[in-house]
């Protein structure tokens, strides 16, 4: 699945879909596969293709779920796309939920509300 997620993100961004449809909300599972790890290569590809915006800018138009192991992988995705583009994700609630949920406070509320365009009264 990580390959498919990586290809999907690259296709959406390099294909200009996010630029043509700026209000389109796409949430990619598992932190986008290997996209954070390969971002620099895709950035070079975007430059070679002559895209109007950078790969990094368009990457931040997507949403990513946090269904990753805690640690370096999660940290890399957050540093690549920003905490404000992360939402909580899990396959089976409970057994794979992070032990420390405080890192996901913003993802569990504010970001999910934005992504789902829900009304919110604080």
Give the positions of each predicted feature:
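Short, flexible loop segments at the rims of nucleotide/cofactor-binding pockets, characterized by
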Residues: 3-5, 63-67
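Histidine/acidic residue-rich metal-binding segments in metalloenzymes
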Residues: 1-57, 72-84
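Mid-to-C-terminal alpha-helical segments outside catalytic/metal-binding sites
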Residues: 24, 34, 64, 71-87, ...
